[in-house]
Each structure stands twice: as structure tokens, then as C-alpha cells.
């Protein structure tokens, strides 16, 4: 399984989940816009829908919508969640909203869809399950760990598997955190908060050097 080459933000295409986040609408509504040709899209050989980012920008302009950019603002954390369980995704999003942290989260049920969108999204945090249909979390992380994006990515595996079972499957790449289900939301809150604090410290240090 190969990962798409890294692209500049908003250059090229994205999947339906990312398009929905950019437009502030549901995935179903995005699919409806594609069917009405309001958004330009095509499908990969694997059947995954790709949507032109240029057509999303054009749609926003036609309808006088403010561009909803996940790439704007260094103070916001970009979080990508890969989890095939609907209830877990909803629970994570509800907690993110409740915490009020400056983050933008994009949810995926498919590891393949997430891989296709990562060059456009350029997340700083990845939360991923391991047991998923088609491409599982082990294969997902193996593919991702060979890509340049991985070096600057904070990764947390969220799984119902025990540490022993994970190790028996080959283990995780170095630096990946293991968080077992049921999810300790206090730990996750603290982890994300700490990442944001470190980013602020690093930005101040760069500003002082400049």
C-alpha cells in the first residue's frame, strides 16, 4: 500500500470527510453536491471518491461562504481520527467540543481514506484504532511510518487489544502511544493540552530567535 506524495495545502484533491469539514456540512450533503456536479469529483481504482479542492473553493465563492480552512492559524491543532466505530467517533467529537481546546478534528472510518487525505490535511496528531476492516491499524501505521509526514506527527493508538496482543502482532512504531479502551478521556485531554503548550513554547522560542 503506497501513500500519496505530500502536496502543498489545498493543492489537488481530498476525500469526502475532509470536504465536509471544510464546508461545514455532512458527508451525505457533500455526496449530494457531487451528484449535482456542484463539486468536481472522481473515484480512484479502489472506489474512493476524490474531490477537487479548487471546486470546493469555487463553491464557497459562488455561495458567498467564508473559506473554512483547517490549515489557518498556527495556534490550532489539526487532529485526524481513524476509527471504524461510529459511537467512538461521536464520543471523541463530543469531548473535543466540550473541552473547548483550539483544535480541528477530522473523523475517518477508513484508514485508506485517511491516508489519501493526509497530504492535504497535514495533521499534527493522529488517533487511530488497530482493528479495522480492509486496511487495519498495523498496516496503516507501517505505511505511514515510512512517510515524511510521520516524523512530525504525534500518534496515539486507541484499541481494545492488550499490550501483549499488540506486541504479538508486531508491535507499534517507535514513539507511538498506546491508549486502551475504554478510553481514558482525562489522559487524552491532558495529552492534547500538553502538545498545545509545547507548540506555544516552540513558537515563542522561534519568535525570539527571529
Predicted feature descriptions by range:
Residues 9, 13-18, 36-65:
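Short helix-start
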Residues 107-116, 137:
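Helix N-cap/capping motif at the beta->alpha junctions
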Residues 56-80:
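A short, Lys/Arg-enriched interface patch at domain edges and termini
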Residues 132:
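Receiver (REC) domain active-site loop signature in two-component systems and cognate sites
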Residues 156-158:
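Hydrophobic/aromatic residues positioned on beta-strands within the core alpha/beta folds
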Residues 55, 183-195:
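C-terminal output helix
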Residues 139, 162-179, 190:
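Alpha4 helix (beta4-alpha4-beta5 surface) of REC/receiver domains from two-component response regulators
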